[in-house]
Amino acid sequence: MVGGGALRRVGKYEVGRTIGEGTFAKVKFAQNTESGESVAMKVVDRSSILKHKMADQIKREISIMKLVRHPNVVRLHEVLASRKKIFIILEFITGGELFDKIIRHGRLNEADARRYFQQLIDGVDFCHSKGVYHRDLKPENLLLDSQGNLKISDFGLSAWPAQGGALLRTTCGTPNYVAPEVLSHKGYDGALADTWSCGVILYVLLAGYLPFDEVDLTTLYGKIESAEYSFPAWFPNGAKSLIHRILDPNPDKRIRIEEIRNDEWFKKNYEPTREIESEEVNLDDVNAAFDDPEEDADHTLDDEAGPLTLNAFDLIILSQGLNLAALFDRRQDYDKLQNRFLSRKPAKVIMSSMEVVAQSMGYKTHIRNYKMRVEGLNANKTSHLAVMLEIFEVAPSIFMIELQRAAGDTSDYNKFINNYCSKLDDIIWNFPIEKSKSRISRLSKR
């Protein structure tokens, strides 16, 4: 069973709580009732695809991604549809974002950075060989599995329409990882644009911060277009040389992936990822989703009338290894709390307080049932930020509030969370730590 509250079903999948939300899709945790496998279900409005006349392109990219079988790319299992929704069933990754690892622990050592970069290049190169380009590569789109291996998410799906009518997410999101030819809105080679982003990611892994990072967009664009950046003193010389060749603002002179593979720094301790053996893949589900969707009574995902109730299984999934004490410990910073806190106030009081605080900070709020979307410009007034908040009941009269980034830069989001949560002392519950640990211990033994 996926969780408490009103259980919903899409085909053979039991659908649980929302685990992510973007500008055009929601991602929900789900479970295959036949195999017991946990999956991520991306729920997309068909109208957003039809509005931008991208059905053929999206169908093509989904078809290709279903054919892609690579250990460093999040796997697309199948596609389902109703008249109003398309449901994309994806591999469920438990290790979190690579960006969070950098936020918590700082820059990586050279060996770890090289290993992640090698896996990134393996996955990117394989998808390029299938004719699919990412266009929005950044650490937030790089996930880690339970073994610490890198998984690239949203490959093949990044050209989907975003809010505001832009066709490429790279042109409407944070530009720090984007190649100069993309920012100039000229035609560009998708493979070379992805290569540039890989170079920026390598810099971030080794330095712990961005090579291009300015308060105002005009200055930022100028530095990206001229490739104006510098290295910290500790930066490995071999990596410096490789990054210089990748971050060439002239795409005609920029190093290509096959040349990256031959670089001496890259080749050290390199073990090429073993590709998954080819298997017969049926595309009938993709064709049916776009060509002749049928309304199915099971294919309904309505918003809940009240807060969802989370059971023990949900809490274990949230805890990533039974480390539930973090939910109760206000002595940790909010990043390490995984952006969740508890409250004993009534759910309506919690929602009202969160709305008032968000509006006092200059953000707009949109409330539906026990979910709230907060959006506006970041602290520097340079880019859009959107945050989703949802209230869950974890025990009688005890509620958990979860915050998730819906749009905008992760660093801006982290700053918002720390500022926002510091203003919510009246509703955050300071639970006794030792008592929480004993209850968690009893829960885990059941």
From Swiss-Prot:
GO terms for biological process: response to nitrate; root development; signal transduction. Its EC number is 2.7.11.1. Residues 13-266 form the Protein kinase domain. It holds the Pfam family Pkinase. SUPFAM superfamilies: Protein kinase-like (PK-like) (SSF56112). Keywords: ATP-binding, Kinase, Manganese, Nucleotide-binding, Serine/threonine-protein kinase, Transferase. SMART domains: S_TKc (SM00220). Its cofactor is Mn(2+). Residues 336-365 are annotated as: PPI. CDD domains: CIPK_C. It catalyses: L-seryl-[protein] + ATP = O-phospho-L-seryl-[protein] + ADP + H(+); L-threonyl-[protein] + ATP = O-phospho-L-threonyl-[protein] + ADP + H(+). One of its GO terms (molecular function) is protein serine kinase activity. Residues 301-329 form the NAF domain. Residues 154-181 are annotated as: Activation loop. ATP binds at I19, G20, E21, G22, T23, F24, A25, K26, V27, K42. The active site is at D136. Induction: By salt stress. The activation loop within the kinase domain is the target of phosphorylation/activation by upstream protein kinases. The PPI motif mediates the interaction with the ABI (abscisic acid-insensitive) phosphatases. CIPK serine-threonine protein kinases interact with CBL proteins. Binding of a CBL protein to the regulatory NAF domain of CIPK protein lead to the activation of the kinase in a calcium-dependent manner. Belongs to the protein kinase superfamily. CAMK Ser/Thr protein kinase family. SNF1 subfamily. This is CBL-interacting protein kinase 8. It comes from Oryza sativa subsp. japonica (Rice). The lineage of its organism: Eukaryota, Viridiplantae, Streptophyta, Embryophyta, Tracheophyta. The gene is CIPK8.
